[in-house]
Structure formats: structure tokens, C-alpha cells
Amino acid sequence: IPPKKVASTQFLNKMRKTVLRICHERTGKKFDINKNGQIGKYKAQPQTDSQFLLYYLLMADPIFEKWLLNPTLNAMMDYLMKGTQQLSSMTSFIKWQGEGYGETLGLHSDTRPSTPEGLIPSSWFDVSNSTYCLTDYTKENGAMAMVPGSHRLYRQPKPGEGVDKAVPVEAKAGSLIIFNGGIWHGAFPKKTEGLRLNVTSYFCHRKLKTQDAYQ
């Protein structure tokens, strides 16, 4: 979804600035959008030499509450999840130049099947995910990787499976990426210097326990 249908440039800039401030608060290191990051004292899982996650963003600053109420985000989640959704977690992937997830691209599905064989899938709208791009997404810049049609397989990929079919999800800063939880997704390694930032809002059915401990 293009930036003009998501939020104003002013909101985007404020969100980016807020995420960088939280990076500093949690790592003890200064962050510059044009320079590679540092993990510092911060420890979170999953974590690589060129990426970490910021958790519990909803309570970190009022701007994330405003984002949760964004009309475009909510309209798309209502469509995908038939109005049954609740916020499960709000995080930010802080990524910089490096190998990232390696050759597998970290491909996975957010929706796990009800059986190991994947014959009886979970409901189509048990989970859906979204990525608000705070920087440009290109393959060289470490964009998301998705495997078209993989949501029809109703299972997790085997190690290395799907890499040859993965395509980059390229988008301008301010764009919103929305996807069903069943599609295999990960990310390409970032080849360029500087940060790739986002805010990921993950939604689940109200029958499921949320990832973040919301009350």
C-alpha cells in the first residue's frame, strides 16, 4: 500500500525518530539512519550480528497507540481477519549491513498447521501480519522475502526450501505491507550501509493468546 494511503510524511518522520530514540535507550548506543547499527547492551531473540528486535513498542510511546488506530491498517486487518483480530505484538526489526539470516533467508510461516503433516490447516484468519516501512525496501537494502503461493501448502518450509522462489517485497518508506500469516516470508541480507527500519504489527484471532502480555 503506497505511503499516501497510509499516513502523512510528518507521521512517518516522527515514527522513525521515535524508533531510533528507543534503540538508543535500550542499547546504550547512538543510532544514525545512514550508519550501521550496534547491539550494545541489548539482548533479544531472535538476534543476529546485523539485526535485533525492539519489543513491547505499544507501551513505549504514544505514537504507537496512534499507529494501532491507523484507518488503513485496521481496514486491511478487518478484511483479512473478518473483524476477529486483536493485536498480538508490536515490534521493530532494526537491521543493518550483514549476512542477516544467511542462505535460508529465515523463511517461515506465522500460521502453524493443526497437524504435523499440514493436512488440516489452522483457520485462514488465525493470524495476519503487517510491516510499516520506515526506510526504503529494496533487495539490496534487505527487503522482506516472500514465496508466492506458499500459503496454500499449510506448513512450515523445510530448511532451505523456497529460497529459489523467494521474491523481494520492494516498497518506498511510508508504505504498508500486509500479508496472511500462512505465507512463507523472511528477509534478504542487507548489502548497503545504514539502517533498515520498520514497525511490525502482528495480529491474531481473539481466541489465541497474544505474544505481548497485554491486559
Model-derived segments and spans:
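A short, structured loop/turn motif at beta-sheet edges
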Residues: S8-Q10, K172-S175, K207
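A structural signal for short, well-ordered beta-strand segments
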Residues: S89-S92, S130-Y132, V199-F203
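Non-heme Fe(II)/2-oxoglutarate
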Residues: G28, L176, I183-W184, F188-Q215
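Short hydrophobic-aromatic micro-motifs
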Residues: P2, Y132, I177-F179
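Non-heme Fe(II)-dependent double-stranded beta-helix
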Residues: P3-T115
